[in-house]
């Protein structure tokens, strides 16, 4: 299972744990390195033992800075209950976006994704471009797809500010259509 985006963000077990998928192999990255290049492949004992009988090459196999970064990430992850934090602030963002989507049907259809990474599904592509541009003009990078990730840096105050800015932009777009 590809857990590049979901691994660690949704807890130690990732999406496969949250949704009950059986996995023989798992791939982790991105969040594990917190910006440093790293990827991890894990699997069942039988699969991982089979790997020991073959030769695997990696361009970055001797790059130890990323391993140190991953070690630090895992320490912070456990100490700060990162997945729990992401779930709380993500739910706040998701529910706020849902209120916006429910109010402005001429601009948005719904909030989509999951709390940890969600987006507003606009009525059409042109509207999503206008939403992203309006948010950028407000100093907010708000992507048009499910890559609006919450992070450990997001607090309730930060999320409320995001929702205010997005809400103002959506309100302005709706007013232009009236």
Model-predicted regions and their roles:
Residues 1-178:
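Conserved N-terminal phosphate-binding loop of PLP-dependent enzymes in the Aspartate aminotransferase
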């Amino acid at each position: 299972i590809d857990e590049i985006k979901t691994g660690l963000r949704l807890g130690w077990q990732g999406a496969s744990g949250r949704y009950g998928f059986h996995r023989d192999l798992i791939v982790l990255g991105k969040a594990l390195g917190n910006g440093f290049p790293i990827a991890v492949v894990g699997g069942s004992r039988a699969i991982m033992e089979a790997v020991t009988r073959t030769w695997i090459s990696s361009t970055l196999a001797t790059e130890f800075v990323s391993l140190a970064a991953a070690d630090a990430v895992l320490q912070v992850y456990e100490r700060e209950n990162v997945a729990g934090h992401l779930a709380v602030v993500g739910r706040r963002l998701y529910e706020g976006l849902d209120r916006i989507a429910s109010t402005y049907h001429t601009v948005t259809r719904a909030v989509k994704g999951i709390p940890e990474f969600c987006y507003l599904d606009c009525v059409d592509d042109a509207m999503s471009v206008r939403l992203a541009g309006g948010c950028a003009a407000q100093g907010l990078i708000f992507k048009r797809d499910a890559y609006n990730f919450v992070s450990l840096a997001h607090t309730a105050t930060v999320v409320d500010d995001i929702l205010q800015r997005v809400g103002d932009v959506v309100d302005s777009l709706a007013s232009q259509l009236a």
